[in-house]
């Protein structure tokens, strides 16, 4: 799905292998707060290796004696990885369950503490990643590329995981827009997200291709750093350009839905022109009831550090909720993901 999308720093020359072992992909979830210690929900921090999120949630539900829909999470995590993530168990008026029964060689309970709010999808600050890429080849320019990514970022593309194996989530969305009824709400949401993500990626790729990844267009919608507050100005000013250069504001692209575009003027015309070939997709998202939203055009990994040792690169960084680690890797090198006989279910994204 991402093969035709533009690269911010040009097509990478380096090659490597991602996830040769589960320990090569470590994700630690950061809620951004600590559970308060009281309330009818129990937040459970779990370390799991080679297990998917839904399976572990089912084990926790059985241990707590509750229905499986009483167990929630902030974001799906890759199966072939070592991940630390939080689960929420709704236990109103019930005593603390013995969750140790779910522990095994691949599952450890790290913490359990009550909280007064439900753990919902996206209810987190972000994720800390430590990746180990092996079998490096043609890596002479890798150090310079790492420096460029650290200072300029990468395209904030939705990763392959959003679209399903072979793009089957998009095929399902297309069928749904053509009139096929999807009764399962979760599947329907998945297909709508895939369609919306495809359109977003198309806008981002077009801006990069036109040399507009770091350049303001009249009417561009920008987002304040560290918040989801957005605004647009039809008349470009030196002050706004300076704020963009300093990182105080970020360029954004449309997440398509009902209502007026938040961008104006030339920026709105650009987005509409890019999406003109996707009119049926846009119409389908609007009829499904999704509203216009925005997402940053670029993604700048935080706390980024790395160690190059022969044919092995160890890379660490923090990404905000909703961002994809594989989008960082894609810009860095042509990484082949080791085949472990199952599809990775997600990429530590928070379910934008």
Curated annotation (Swiss-Prot):
Keyword hit for Isomerase: yes
Pfam families (UniProt xref): TruD
E.C. number(s) listed in UniProt: 5.4.99.27
GO cellular component: cytosol
Domain TRUD: 153-299
UniProt-listed GO biological process terms: tRNA pseudouridine synthesis
Keywords, ordered alphabetically: Isomerase, tRNA processing
PROSITE patterns associated with the record: TRUD, UPF0024
Top-level taxon: Bacteria
Cystine residue pairs: none
Active site feature: 78 (nucleophile)
Molecular function as annotated in GO: RNA binding; tRNA pseudouridine(13) synthase activity
Record field: catalytic activity: uridine(13) in tRNA = pseudouridine(13) in tRNA
InterPro entries the UniProt entry points to: PsdUridine_synth_cat_dom_sf, PsdUridine_synth_TruD, PsdUridine_synth_TruD_CS, PsdUridine_synth_TruD_insert, TruD_catalytic, TruD_insert_sf, TruD_pseudoU_synthase
SUPFAM superfamilies the UniProt entry points to: Pseudouridine synthase
PANTHER family the record matches: TRNA PSEUDOURIDINE SYNTHASE D
Family membership: Belongs to the pseudouridine synthase TruD family.
Role noted for this protein: Responsible for synthesis of pseudouridine from uracil-13 in transfer RNAs.
Name this protein carries in UniProt: tRNA pseudouridine synthase D
């Amino acid at each position: 799905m991402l093969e035709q999308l533009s690269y911010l720093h040009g097509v990478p020359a380096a090659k490597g292998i991602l996830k040769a072992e589960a320990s090569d992909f470590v994700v630690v979830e950061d809620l951004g707060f600590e559970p308060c210690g009281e309330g009818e929900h129990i937040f459970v921090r779990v370390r799991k290796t080679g297990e998917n999120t839904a399976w572990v949630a089912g084990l926790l539900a059985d241990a707590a004696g509750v229905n499986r829909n009483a167990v929630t999470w902030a974001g799906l995590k890759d199966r072939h990885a070592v991940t630390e993530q939080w689960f929420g168990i709704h236990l109103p008026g019930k005593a603390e369950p013995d969750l140790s029964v779910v522990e095994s060689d691949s599952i450890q309970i790290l913490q359990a503490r009550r909280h007064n709010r439900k753990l919902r999808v996206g209810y987190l600050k972000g994720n800390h990643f430590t990746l180990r890429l092996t079998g490096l080849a043609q890596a002479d320019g890798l150090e310079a590329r790492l420096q460029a990514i650290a200072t300029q970022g990468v395209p904030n593309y939705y990763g392959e995981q959003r679209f399903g194996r072979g793009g089957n989530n998009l095929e399902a969305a297309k069928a749904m827009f053509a009139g096929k009824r999807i009764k399962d709400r979760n599947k329907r949401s998945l297909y709508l997200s895939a369609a919306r993500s495809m359109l977003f990626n198309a806008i981002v790729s077009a801006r990069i291709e036109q040399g507009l990844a770091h350049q303001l267009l009249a009417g561009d919608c920008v987002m304040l750093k560290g918040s989801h507050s957005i605004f647009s100005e039809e008349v470009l000013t030196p002050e706004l350009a300076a704020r963009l250069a300093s990182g105080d504001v970020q360029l954004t692209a449309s997440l398509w839905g009902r209502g007026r575009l938040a961008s104006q003027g030339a920026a709105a015309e650009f987005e509409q022109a890019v999406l003109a070939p996707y009119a049926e997709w846009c119409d389908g998202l609007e009829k499904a009831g999704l509203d216009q939203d925005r997402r940053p055009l670029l993604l700048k990994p935080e706390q980024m550090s790395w160690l190059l040792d022969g044919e092995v690169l160890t890379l660490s960084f923090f990404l905000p909720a909703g961002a994809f680690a594989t989008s960082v890797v894609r810009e860095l090198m042509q990484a082949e993901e080791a085949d472990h006989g199952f599809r990775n279910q997600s990429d530590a994204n928070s379910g934008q």
